[in-house]
C-alpha cells in the first residue's frame, strides 16, 4: 500500500529519537508562527491516472500556555491554507482541501488540548493534537500536518520514557473535520502503549504496541547504536521491526504481515553514506494505517519508506543507497540523493515484480540577517514500478518560522 501523502525527510533520519517525556515541563507562554509556501507537481508517465498540480500558501499558529498554579494549561494551533493553483487531479494531492473534483483553501483548529501536569516528569493531554510516536505519527509533508483527537499520558520512570494513547478520531492533512475510525460501516477506537530508553553508551531502544478494536493490531521495535570510529568518523546501525495481524471481523479477512529494516549510516566530515535493507514477510504487504488512510495519515518509520514508495508490498525486498552532504562552503546548504530498488514483489499478475525510486533533494536555511528563519527546499522523485504507475514528482517548499513571544 502506498501512502501518497508521505512523510518529511527528517522523520526517517531521526527515527530513533521520537520519544521524549516532558522531563522539564515548560511553564512560560509561547506563540510561534510558521508560513509555508508549497508547490506540488505529479506527472503520471503512463496509465489512466490524472496528472496533478497544486500550490498553496499555508499558515500555522502555535500557542502554548503556562500551567495555571503549576497544574493545568491549554495549547492550541490554527492550521490554514490559501489556494494558489490547482489543476488536473489536484484533489488527490493532499495540498488543498478536496471538494469533489475540485479543491479549495481551508482553515481548522488543528490542535486544541488541555494539559495537566502530574509531577515533574508526567503530563496528561486531552483533545486535538499532532502526535509523533512510531505507531501513530501525524504527517507534515504538505501544507499543514494531519492531527489526532486523543488522550495521551507521557511520563518518565527510572530513565524510561513511557506513553499511553487513546484515540477515537483523526483528521488527514487539509481536512477540517475529525472523523471516527471506521471499516465496513463500523466504528472503532485505538489504544497504544510505548516507551524507550537511551543508555549512556548511545544505545537506544524503543517498543510500541497498538490495537484498533476488532480491526488491526501492530507491534513496533527499534534499536539503534552509534559507533565512534576516530577522527570524527562514526557508524550508526539502526534496526526497525513491525508486526501486524487483524484483530477481528472489521478488517474483512485474515491478515498477518511483518517488516524488517536494517540501515548502516557512515559519517565522515560533511558526508554521510547510508546502506539500508528492508524485507516484508507474512501473507501480505505491510499495512501500517489504522483506517486505510481515510483519515489516519500514519507514516512508516523505516529508511526505505521514501518520498513516494514505501517498499512494503507482499514479500518485497529492497535495498537503498543514500548520500547526504552538508556544503561547508555554503553554511545552511544540504544535499541528499538516494536510490531504492525493490524486487520479489507478489502481485495478482506477477510473482517477482520490481519497482525503484530515485530521490534528489536540496535545502538551504538562511543563517543570519533579516531572512534568518527562512528555509527553501526542493524534492524530486522518479518512480518506476511494475505494480503502480510510473511517476515523476516535484515538490518546492519555502518555510518561514518565527517566535512572537
What kind of region is each of these model predictions?
Residues 11, 15-128, 155, 325-328, ...:
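Beta-barrel outer-membrane channel/assembly domains of diderm bacteria
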Residues 37-39, 124-138, 162-168, 193, ...:
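Transmembrane beta-strand segments that form the barrel wall of outer-membrane beta-barrel proteins
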Residues 53-57, 106-110, 145-149, 156-158, ...:
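Residues that define the transmembrane beta-barrel architecture of outer-membrane proteins
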Residues 61, 112-114, 151-153, 162, ...:
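Membrane-embedded beta-strands of outer-membrane beta-barrel proteins
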Residues 70-74, 120-124, 159-164, 171, ...:
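Repeated loop/turn-to-beta-strand initiation elements of outer-membrane beta-barrel proteins
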Residues 118, 138-145, 169-172, 185-187, ...:
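Solvent-exposed loop/turn segments connecting transmembrane beta-strands
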Residues 163-190, 232-314, 378-396:
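Outer-membrane beta-barrel translocator/channel fold
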Residues 284-350, 357-367:
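C-terminal structural cap/anchor segments
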Amino acid at each position: 500500500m502506498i501512502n501518497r501523502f508521505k512523510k518529511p525527510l527528517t522523520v526517517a533520519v531521526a527515527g530513533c529519537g521520537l520519544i521524549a517525556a516532558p522531563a522539564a515541563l515548560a511553564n512560560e507562554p509561547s506563540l510561534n508562527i510558521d508560513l509555508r509556501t508549497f508547490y506540488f507537481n505529479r506527472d503520471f508517465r503512463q496509465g489512466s491516472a490524472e496528472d496533478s498540480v497544486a500550490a498553496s500558501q499555508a499558515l500555522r499558529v502555535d500557542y502554548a500556555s503556562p500551567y495555571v498554579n503549576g497544574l493545568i494549561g491549554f495549547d492550541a494551533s490554527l492550521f490554514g491554507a490559501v489556494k494558489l493553483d490547482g489543476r488536473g487531479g489536484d484533489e488527490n494531492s493532499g495540498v488543498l482541501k478536496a471538494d469533489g473534483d475540485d479543491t479549495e483553501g481551508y482553515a481548522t483548529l488543528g490542535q486544541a488540548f488541555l494539559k495537566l501536569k502530574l509531577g515533574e516528569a508526567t503530563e496528561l493531554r486531552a483533545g486535538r493534537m499532532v502526535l509523533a510516536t512510531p505507531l501513530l505519527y501525524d504527517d507534515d509533508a504538505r501544507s499543514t500536518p494531519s492531527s489526532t483527537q486523543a488522550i495521551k499520558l507521557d511520563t518518565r520512570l527510572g530513565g524510561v520514557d513511557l506513553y499511553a494513547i487513546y484515540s477515537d478520531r483523526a483528521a488527514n492533512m487539509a481536512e477540517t473535520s475529525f472523523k471516527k475510525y471506521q471499516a465496513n460501516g463500523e466504528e472503532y477506537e485505538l489504544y497504544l502503549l510505548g516507551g524507550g530508553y537511551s543508555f549512556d553508551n548511545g544505545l537506544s531502544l524503543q517498543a510500541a504496541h497498538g490495537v484498533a478494536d476488532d480491526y488491526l493490531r501492530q507491534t513496533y521495535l527499534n534499536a539503534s547504536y552509534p559507533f565512534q570510529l576516530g577522527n570524527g568518523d562514526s557508524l550508526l546501525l539502526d534496526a526497525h521491526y513491525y508486526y501486524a495481524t487483524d484483530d477481528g471481523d472489521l478488517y474483512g479477512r485474515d491478515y498477518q504481515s511483518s517488516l524488517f529494516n536494517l540501515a548502516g549510516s557512515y559519517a565522515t566530515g560533511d558526508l554521510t553514506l547510508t546502506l539500508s535493507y528492508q524485507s516484508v514477510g507474512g501473507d501480505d504487504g505491510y499495512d501500517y494505517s489504522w483506517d486505510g488512510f481515510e483519515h489516519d495519515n500514519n507514516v512508516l518509520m523505516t529508511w526505505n519508506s521514501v518520498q513516494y514508495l514505501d517498499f512494503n508490498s507482499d514479500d518485497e525486498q529492497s535495498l537503498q543507497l543514500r548520500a547526504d552532504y552538508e556544503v561547508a562552503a555554503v553554511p545552511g546548504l544540504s544535499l541528499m540523493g538516494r536510490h531504492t530498488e525493490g524486487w520479489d514483489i507478489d502481485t495478482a499478475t506477477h510473482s517477482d515484480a520490481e519497482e525503484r525510486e530515485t530521490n534528489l533533494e536540496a535545502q538551504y536555511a538562511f543563517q543570519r540577517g533579516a531572512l534568518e528563519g527562512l528555509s527553501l527546499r526542493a524534492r524530486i522523485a522518479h518512480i518506476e514500478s511494475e505494480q503502480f504507475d510510473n511517476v515523476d514528482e516535484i515538490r518546492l517548499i519555502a518555510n518561514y518560522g518565527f517566535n512572537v513571544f
